[in-house]
Amino acid sequence: MKTLLLTLVVVAIVCLDLGYTLTCLICPEKDCQKVHTCRNEEKICVKRFYDKNQLGWRAQRGCAVSCPKAKPNETVQCCSTDKCNK
């Protein structure tokens, strides 16, 4: 009986998704507080700065599977801890 119970506990632990889910900020404002839970495959928080037609720099934040390459007139910052893309 103890063996059966132990087996059931092990199976339950293996079947549960015990993985860590990253959270990143997702708003463009400088003092962004809007948090988004990333999908399981998204392990990177991204913050992109880009020049918006002489209106100054804008930021775009979110989750990503990998760190994207910067486009012309753009700066990309990537990190991998919760809400690190401030």
Curated annotation (Swiss-Prot):
CDD domains linked to this entry: TFP_snake_toxin
Which family is this protein grouped under? Belongs to the three-finger toxin family. Ancestral subfamily. Orphan group II sub-subfamily.
- Say yes or no: keyword Disulfide bond present: yes
Q: Which SUPFAM superfamilies match?
A: Snake toxin-like
Briefly state the protein's biological role: Binds with low affinity to muscular (alpha-1-beta-1-delta-epsilon/CHRNA1-CHRNB1-CHRND-CHRNE) and very low affinity to neuronal (alpha-7/CHRNA7) nicotinic acetylcholine receptor (nAChR).
Name of the protein: Weak toxin 1
- Chief location category: secreted
Q: List the disulfide bonds.
A: 24-45, 27-32, 38-63, 67-78, 79-84
Q: Where in the cell is it found?
A: Secreted
One of the record's GO cellular component terms: extracellular region
Keywords from the named record: Acetylcholine receptor inhibiting toxin, Disulfide bond, Ion channel impairing toxin, Neurotoxin, Postsynaptic neurotoxin, Secreted, Signal, Toxin
Matching entries from Gene3D superfamilies are given as: CD59
Q: Which GO terms describe its molecular function?
A: acetylcholine receptor inhibitor activity; ion channel regulator activity; toxin activity
> What are the boundaries of the signal sequence?
1-23
Source species = Bungarus candidus
Domain of life, per lineage:
Eukaryota
Q: In which tissues is it expressed?
A: Expressed by the venom gland.
Q: What Pfam families does the annotation carry?
A: Toxin_cobra-type (PF21947)
